[in-house]
Structure formats: C-alpha cells, structure tokens
C-alpha cells in the first residue's frame, strides 16, 4: 500500500489534463514528474491528431480557477453566445445557449491552452520530460521504461505510482491491461470527422459572426465551425463512413468540393483551401471508451480520456477531464494511502463519466437532425418559458451541463424528465398559445425538485 505521505506521483502525458493535474498537485506540495511522448510544443510547434478547437464551459473554468490558471487561459479564448444554424435555404439563425451573455461558452485553441498550462505546471514545480514514450511497466517493482523515438534510446525510472493522462490511446492503459484486464470496450460511431479552416479576412477579423458556434445541420451529417482568437475558424465535417454521402464516396478534393457546393453552399467560398486540406487531413475516428475499473490499487490510475473517452458533440471531454483533476486532488487530500484515494476517485466519478458519455452521443442527434426541426424549436421555446417561470426547478439541460456544475448523472436524470414534459406539453401544438400553464405548473412541481445552484 502506497502511503500518501511520500507525496510523489509520476504522470504519463503532458496534454491538457496532465498539465492541469500537475499544477494542482504541485501547488499542494506533491513532487510531480511528467513524461510526454511528443516534443516540447513551445520549441517545435504543436503536434496532435486531436481537434484543435475546444469548448470551455463553467466546469472547466472552475478547475482552472482552482489551479490559478483561469486568467492566462481566458486571455486566449473567444466567447460563443450560441449556435448559428445555417439551413440549406434561408438565412442563418442564432440559437442562444443561455439567457444572456453571462451564459456563454468559450472557444480555445488546443495548442494555446496546452502551452499555457505547460508553462504554469513548470512554474508550480512540476518536472516535465519530453520525447519519452512509455514502453514497458513493471508494476510490482515500480519500474518503467521509456523510449526516445528520435534515437530509440531507452530511459528507465522508478516510480511510486503512475497516473495516466495520456488520452484515448493511453499507453499506460495498455500496460495496465497486460498486468490485469480492465474490461476495456470501445464503441466506434459509424461516422468520422475531417478538419478544415476558414482563414481571416485579408485585413484581419472573422469572415462570419465570430461569437458563435456555426452549424450546418443536414440530417445524417453536419458541418460545424468554431472561432479562434486569430480570426480563423476551425471547420469540422462529420460524415458517415459508408453510404451517400460518406467518406467512402468523398475521397478526393474535387469530390469534397462538389459535396460542399451541393450541401454547404454558403460555407464553400469561406474555405479556399478545401481541396488541399481534404486530401492532406485523414478522417478522425469517433468513439466511446468504457472500462470496468480505472486503477490498479495504488500503483496506477487513469483519468480523462484515458479512462472514459467520449464523442465530442457536447463539448465536455476537456471539461470532464478537468473535473477529474480537481476530484482526484481532493481525494488525495482526504485519504492516507493512494489505493483508497484512487478507489474513492473512481467511485465519485464513474457514474458522471458514463452520463456525459451518453449525453454526448444524444447531442449529436440533436445537432445534426433537430436544430432546424419545428417540433424541437417549439420545445425549446417552451423550455425557455418554463425556466423563466420556475428557474430553480425547470433548468434546461444545456444550462445544467454547461453553465452550472450539476453532477452529470443528475443532469441526465433531470433532462430525461424535462424532455418528457416538453414533448407531452407541445404534442399537437404549433405554438404556445393553447398551453395549459396551471397543469404544467403542477407537473413541474411534482416531478422536479429545486436544483442547487440554479437561479
């Protein structure tokens, strides 16, 4: 059993979660060493197969505040007020996320965020070693070997405990699995994604509304664009792997150009390098990872995507991982040995991770199929009215997940009740003029208790 009194931890992965956890633990007096497979992004530029834009919500901002990192990060973020929905015919319409500009989310470039957190981790006292790819682990002897892929040289260390913050393709998870099966399962979507770019205007500034997440919903597929602080947008096309249209039928730049001309005509002139980027950027996979357990007693633990990777459609992967970091730091404070702290962390986070994984999958259907559906828009209108009348009881799904820090599992349970109420109340109606408000009040008060933090 590893006593917390030794206060030494080795992190695998200097990405977003690894750097934030390194800050939190270093500030609490832990000796933290981080090993990263890639080179230092501050020297050689950022390399990642991951999406280069992220949506930062209140959960993530709260974690950054705990680490003293919020100001440095928010200086690089762009506010997004809502979804700007681009129909095939007609003008784009903004669907606000919240009631006003106090309820927004923030777009941030993954590289800028990673560099900011890396700087702060080192300032807090963490030691970060680059070009160290985890190769083998002897959990019984507390020994690990890393390889420098530049020269194939091995580097060996002794450790007290390993924490895997090395993402969905976690090398530590693979090593743990070889030691003792974790019950790993990955369910891939039958959709993949490809990233493109909208450049800034010649004189600088955004070519389209900069304070929104743009969506082109087209039923079985969709395109989105998130703003960057340099005036660019990162465009992501989500497309089926097979069928028409799909990545199987849209292989060349010319085929992509034809797809955009037909289905995203207002986006096409904004992406001058569409053909080149289409052929240069391979499609990315989308999947949900589940494990039966996240730790090997006190010797190793997985957090973030390494433990519970999810599809990106709720913008919560990073926010959830940041919540993991705070929860783990708190459990380490509360327990005298690492095995107990790791077990308590997993028990505290497992149901919430499963809930946001489910909600992320559900949000994909909403984004691609429903944001321009009349029934959905009427339900949204009623949702806003119910929130205005009973703000502590009827709290919209998006508000609970994004603007509050309501536990994901609670947000999921309440959202399912609220969806039933909205569907039942609007069935057969084309507007809200004949809604029975007194009957609705009785239903809301009977089925929804006041929610902590709602206002």
From Swiss-Prot:
Cofactor(s) it depends on: FAD
Has keyword RNA-binding? no
The reply to whether Ligase figures as a keyword in the UniProt entry is: no
Catalysed reaction, written as an equation: L-kynurenine + NADPH + O2 + H(+) = 3-hydroxy-L-kynurenine + NADP(+) + H2O
Per its UniProt entry, what is the enzyme's top EC class, as one word?
Answer: oxidoreductase
Q: Which Gene3D superfamilies match?
A: FAD/NAD(P)-binding domain (3.50.50.60)
Its EC number is: 1.14.13.9
Q: Tell me the pathway.
A: Cofactor biosynthesis; NAD(+) biosynthesis; quinolinate from L-kynurenine: step 1/3
Q: GO MF annotations for this entry?
A: FAD binding; kynurenine 3-monooxygenase activity
Family label: Belongs to the aromatic-ring hydroxylase family. KMO subfamily.
What is the stated purpose of this protein?
Catalyzes the hydroxylation of L-kynurenine (L-Kyn) to form 3-hydroxy-L-kynurenine (L-3OHKyn). Required for synthesis of quinolinic acid.
HAMAP family named among the record's database cross-references = Kynurenine_monooxygenase
Instruction: Supply the name of the protein.
Output: Kynurenine 3-monooxygenase
Please name the source species.
Xanthomonas axonopodis pv. citri (strain 306)
**Gene from which this protein is expressed:** kmo
């Amino acid at each position: 059993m590893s006593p917390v009194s030794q206060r030494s931890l080795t992190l695998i992965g200097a990405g977003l979660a690894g750097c934030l956890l390194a800050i939190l633990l270093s500030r609490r007096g832990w000796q933290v060493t981080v090993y990263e497979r890639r080179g230092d992004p501050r020297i050689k530029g950022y390399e990642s197969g991951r999406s280069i834009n992220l949506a930062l919500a209140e959960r993530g901002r709260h974690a950054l505040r705990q680490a003293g990192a919020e100001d440095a990060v928010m200086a690089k973020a762009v506010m997004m007020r809502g979804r700007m929905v681009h129909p095939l015919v007609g003008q784009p319409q903004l669907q606000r996320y919240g009631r006003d500009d106090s309820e927004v989310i923030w777009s941030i470039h993954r590289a800028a965020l990673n560099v900011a957190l890396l700087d702060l981790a080192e300032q807090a006292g963490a030691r970060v070693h680059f070009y160290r790819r985890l190769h083998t682990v002897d959990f019984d002897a507390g020994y690990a070997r890393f390889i420098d892929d530049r020269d194939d040289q091995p580097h060996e260390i002794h450790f007290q405990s390993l924490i895997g913050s090395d993402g969905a393709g976690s090398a530590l998870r693979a090593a743990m699995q070889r030691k003792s099966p974790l019950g790993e399962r990955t369910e891939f979507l039958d959709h993949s994604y490809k990233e493109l770019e909208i450049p800034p205007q010649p004189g600088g500034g955004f070519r389209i509304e900069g304070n929104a997440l743009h969506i082109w919903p087209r039923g079985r597929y969709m395109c989105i664009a998130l703003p960057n602080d340099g005036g660019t947008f990162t465009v992501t096309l989500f497309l089926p792997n097979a069928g028409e249209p799909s990545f199987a039928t849209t292989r060349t730049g010319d085929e992509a150009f034809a797809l955009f001309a037909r289905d995203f005509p207002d986006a096409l002139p904004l992406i001058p390098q569409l053909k080149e980027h289409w052929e240069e950027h391979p499609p990315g996979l989308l999947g949900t990872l589940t494990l039966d357990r996240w730790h090997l007693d006190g010797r190793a633990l997985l957090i973030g995507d390494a433990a519970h990777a999810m599809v990106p459609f709720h913008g919560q992967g990073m926010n959830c991982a940041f919540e993991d970091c705070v929860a783990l730091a708190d459990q380490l404070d509360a327990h005298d040995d690492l095995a107990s702290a790791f077990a308590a962390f997993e028990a505290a986070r497992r149901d919430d991770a499963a809930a946001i994984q489910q909600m992320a999958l559900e949000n994909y259907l909403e984004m691609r199929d429903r944001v321009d559906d009349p029934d959905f828009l009427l339900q949204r209108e009623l949702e806003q009215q119910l929130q205005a009348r009973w703000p502590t009881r009827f709290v919209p799904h998006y508000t609970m997940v994004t603007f509050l820090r309501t536990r994901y599992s609670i947000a999921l349970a309440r959202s399912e009740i609220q969806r039933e109420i909205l569907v039942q109340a609007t069935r057969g109606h084309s507007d809200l003029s004949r809604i029975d408000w007194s009957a609705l009040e009785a239903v809301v008060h009977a089925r929804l208790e006041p929610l902590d933090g709602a206002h």
